[in-house]
Amino acid sequence: MEHRVFTVANFFSSNHDFITGFFVVLTAVLMFLISLGASRKMQMVPMGLQNVYESIISAILSVAKDIIGEELARKYFPLAGTIALYVFFSNMIGIIPSFESPTASWSFTLVLALIVFFYYHFEGIRVQGFFKYFAHFAGPVKWLAPFMFPIEIISHFSRIVSLSFRLFGNIKGDDMFLLIMLLLVPWVIPVAPFMVLFFMGILQAFVFMILTYVYLAGAVLTDEGH
């Protein structure tokens, strides 16, 4: 990509895909190391990183149980929690000058959206059975089924677009906002913009996690879904 903003990955290659992949891997390594540090020497009375992580887990489960129930919230936490944490770290790494958010690349957010899309359909089919699961797409009124079924199919595929573009658009916009602020005031650290981007990064990770649980609830809760 021409006129790309310089990042630390440019020391190795200027290829767009390489740069995105570099920060995807770097974010994963950082998340793993920080999570490892939080889980080592676990204490009955949590302190430091352990306390932060336990607070995050409790907050996620508290919100998720209102969507899908406590049992299923815990069951699907490994997926939803990991995605939320990874999206958060991906968003935060872009705040650092000369670093780039993996979530500022649509190809990466598309992969995340596809993971959620295929997984919740897999779970819906596994829990309800193939025919019963897709029968819900036709709606309760039989004569409307020929109209409702294709509408539902389009609706589900549109979730891929909405999930990926929402995250990509917000983070890309945040990165451009930060770049402009740094160009305008290069000798003064723009504290306010950094704080705005920090909270926006948390918000986008939260939204992605919530939508993951919402889609799973719609797929596996036979009494309340669809």
Curated annotation (Swiss-Prot):
SUPFAM superfamilies according to UniProt: F1F0 ATP synthase subunit A
Sorted alphabetically, the Gene Ontology BP terms of this entry are: proton motive force-driven plasma membrane ATP synthesis
Primary site of residence = membrane
List the PROSITE patterns: ATPASE_A (PS00449)
Q: How is it placed in the membrane, per its record?
A: Multi-pass membrane protein
Pfam families, per the entry: ATP-synt_A
Q: Provide this UniProt record's keywords sorted from A to Z.
A: ATP synthesis, Cell inner membrane, Cell membrane, CF(0), Hydrogen ion transport, Ion transport, Membrane, Transmembrane, Transmembrane helix, Transport
Q: Give Gene Ontology CC terms.
A: plasma membrane; proton-transporting ATP synthase complex
Origin: domain of life: Bacteria
Tell me which InterPro entries the record gives: ATP_syn_F0_a_bact/chloroplast, ATP_synth_F0_asu, ATP_synth_F0_asu_AS, F0_ATP_A_sf
GO molecular function ontology, one term from the record: proton-transporting ATP synthase activity, rotational mechanism
How this chain assembles, per its entry, is: F-type ATPases have 2 components, CF(1) - the catalytic core - and CF(0) - the membrane proton channel. CF(1) has five subunits: alpha(3), beta(3), gamma(1), delta(1), epsilon(1). CF(0) has three main subunits: a(1), b(2) and c(9-12). The alpha and beta chains form an alternating ring which encloses part of the gamma chain. CF(1) is attached to CF(0) by a central stalk formed by the gamma and epsilon chains, while a peripheral stalk is formed by the delta and b chains.
Q: What's the stated role of this polypeptide?
A: Key component of the proton channel; it plays a direct role in the translocation of protons across the membrane.
Under NCBIfam families, the record lists: ATP_synt_6_or_A (TIGR01131), PRK05815.2-3 (NF004481)
Protein name listed in UniProt? ATP synthase subunit a
Q: Which organism is it from?
A: Helicobacter acinonychis (strain Sheeba)
